[in-house]
């Protein structure tokens, strides 16, 4: 077969092969281009035969070679566009959306477990005749410490690592300042004061499984005539039973808080083992739940309340601790990390 016939055959076969390549043959198209037009391709091999032609025939065949090269080059370019378009169309078809189908329902949010816990506790106190009082998170040193019987040089201030903004302004370490402000304004001629102050508090703790630089407290205060330790115990027993069940009992242990005298730590009988001893109660049968005590006379006197005529009790508990005990949560950081897998457990 002469060179011209070989060129025509190469052109015909190449064009036929190109027509068969679709969107799924991108690699085959590239391989064919290299096999025909590459440095070692079929057309290049045919060009080597030009040197064997006569002087009259060489220009004619050379022109034919250039025409075939130009034709095939354009054919490859056009087919490449067709292959790419087919590939894109196949992807669009595979990912097509039926716009007539109903859309996905929006995911409904729900209250955070700490919000749920706080509202449950507040409902208990409202049912017992307490009022809910909010206060400032940024507080004066005077109300946060001095009004709680903690003067400037009191060593017990070291019990609460504090975030100071200025020498006299700080992030409150407890919600007790709300009690002091409310005590200043209360009219005892209209009856005793019964209040709780929920809110966020701040301490310079290193965050770990059981500590956080911010957490939530609910502190309670009752002041009136003839308020006794028995009233405190009865109130706490009712609160604990409503939160953890009627079968629970409490135990009071002597403790120290500058703003109460006497002061106690309150334990609740273990709700997991019933007091027999387990990993939750550390084999003691009891779980420490909150601190409480009778309001120190100095705290009353600083609010202009006659400590000889009036007495009271105070207590404080943490929402995180209550939630961790109720739901078996072992890491306080889960409340603040925004992990939806954690939050959805309490939906």
Curated annotation (Swiss-Prot):
Q: Which GO terms describe its molecular function?
A: ATP binding; catalytic activity, acting on a protein; magnesium ion binding; phenylalanine-tRNA ligase activity; transferase activity; tRNA binding
List, alphabetically, the Pfam families matched: Phe_tRNA-synt_N, tRNA-synt_2d
Q: What is its main location?
A: cytoplasm
- Alphabetically list the UniProt keywords: Aminoacyl-tRNA synthetase, ATP-binding, Cytoplasm, Ligase, Magnesium, Metal-binding, Nucleotide-binding, Protein biosynthesis
Q: Which annotated residues bind Mg(2+)?
A: 261
Q: Which residues form the signal peptide?
A: none
Q: Which cofactor does it need?
A: Mg(2+)
Organism's domain of life?
Bacteria
Task: Give EC number(s), comma-separated.
Answer: 6.1.1.20
Catalysed reaction per UniProt?
A: tRNA(Phe) + L-phenylalanine + ATP = L-phenylalanyl-tRNA(Phe) + AMP + diphosphate + H(+)
Asked whether the keyword Transcription is assigned, the reply is no
Please state where this protein is localized.
Answer: Cytoplasm
Q: Which GO terms describe its biological process?
A: phenylalanyl-tRNA aminoacylation
Which sequence ranges form a coiled-coil region, renumbered to this chain? none
Q: Which InterPro entries match?
A: aa-tRNA-synth_II, aa-tRNA-synth_II/BPL/LPL, Phe-tRNA-synth_IIc_asu, Phe-tRNA_ligase_II_N, Phe_tRNA_ligase_alpha1_bac, Phenylalanyl-tRNA_Synthase, tRNA-bd_arm
CC per GO annotation? cytoplasm
Q: How is the cofactor bound?
A: Binds 2 magnesium ions per tetramer.
The family assignment reads: Belongs to the class-II aminoacyl-tRNA synthetase family. Phe-tRNA synthetase alpha subunit type 1 subfamily.
Whom does it interact with, and what assembly results? Tetramer of two alpha and two beta subunits.
What name does the UniProt record give this protein? Phenylalanine--tRNA ligase alpha subunit
- Species of origin: Streptococcus pyogenes serotype M1
């Amino acid at each position: 077969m002469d060179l011209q016939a070989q060129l025509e055959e190469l052109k015909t076969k190449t064009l036929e092969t190109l027509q068969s390549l679709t969107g799924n043959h991108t690699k085959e198209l590239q391989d064919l281009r290299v096999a025909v037009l590459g440095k070692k391709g079929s057309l290049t091999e045919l060009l080597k035969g030009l040197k064997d032609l006569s002087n009259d025939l060489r220009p004619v065949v050379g022109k034919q070679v250039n025409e075939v090269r130009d034709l095939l080059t354009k054919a490859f370019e056009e087919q490449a566009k067709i292959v790419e378009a087919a590939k894109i169309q196949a992807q669009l078809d595979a990912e097509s959306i039926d716009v007539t189908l109903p859309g996905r329902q929006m995911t409904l949010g729900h209250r955070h477990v700490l919000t749920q816990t706080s509202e449950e506790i507040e409902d208990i106190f409202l049912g017992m005749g307490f009022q809910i009082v909010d206060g400032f998170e940024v507080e004066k040193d005077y109300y946060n410490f001095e009004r709680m019987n903690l003067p400037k040089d009191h060593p017990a201030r070291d019990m609460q690592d504090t975030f100071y903004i200025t020498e006299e302004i700080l992030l409150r370490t407890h919600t007790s300042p709300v009690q002091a402000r409310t005590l200043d304004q209360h009219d005892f001629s209209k009856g005793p004061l019964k209040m709780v102050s929920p809110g966020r508090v701040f301490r310079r703790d290193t965050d770990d499984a059981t500590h956080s630089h911010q957490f939530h407290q609910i502190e309670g205060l009752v002041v009136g005539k003839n308020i006794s330790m028995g009233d405190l115990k009865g109130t706490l027993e009712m609160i604990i039973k409503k939160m953890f069940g009627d079968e629970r009992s409490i135990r009071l242990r002597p403790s120290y808080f500058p703003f109460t005298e006497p002061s106690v730590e309150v334990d609740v009988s273990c709700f997991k083992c019933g007091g027999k001893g387990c990993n939750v109660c550390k084999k003691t049968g009891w779980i420490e739940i909150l601190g409480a005590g009778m309001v120190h006379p100095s705290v009353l006197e600083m609010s202009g309340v006659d400590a000889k005529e009036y007495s009271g009790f105070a207590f404080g508990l943490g929402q995180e601790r209550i939630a961790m005990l109720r739901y078996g949560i072992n890491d306080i950081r889960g409340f603040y990390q925004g992990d939806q897998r954690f939050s959805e457990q309490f939906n």
